[in-house]
């Protein structure tokens, strides 16, 4: 077990001074906020965060606020500490701005980002994150506290094996959820038809 800051650089996201104004199309940057991340987690049964699924904004700030795809994003407030992996893709040309609601983790060469996301979401690590948070009404994770968190670092080969198994598991969950949704829609149609026949 080693401290998190020995295998990842950790910084906070960008502090927006005003309400974030999202645009449907025509933005020049993507934005990451907790509300959008939670919805993507729930809808997709995955902690992989495709950049193109994020809302767009018209960005007028500096370039140093941009976050590279391949980073791990960890919510820093509100008691929801599920990490996300910002999935790299060749088709995305716009930069990404992450709000200060998140801590941004950029792993070193000894840690695969997708594995870091996975291990942070495991029950033992989630308990450690909750215990490390401060505040009662609005729990917060501080970067300095997170840096001292102890984490297991298996070989890169083992990390890759875990990633591949987790991808299969997430895919199975997505297929199962889709089948259940289709079944639900079919039954709703049957119920409506039966009700019509009784009138």
Predicted regions, residues:
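Short, surface-exposed loop/turn microsegments at beta-strand edges and helix-strand junctions
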Residues: 21-29, 49-51, 65-67, 85-99
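Basic, amphipathic alpha-helical recognition segments used for DNA target recognition
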Residues: 4-8, 100-153
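Generic structural signal for buried aliphatic residues
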Residues: 72-74
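A structural connector/turn signal
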Residues: 61-62, 92, 136
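Non-catalytic DNA-recognition/assembly elements of restriction-modification systems
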Residues: 1-27, 153-199
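Sequence-specific dsDNA recognition surfaces
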Residues: 5-20, 37-69
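A short beta-sheet element
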Residues: 76-118
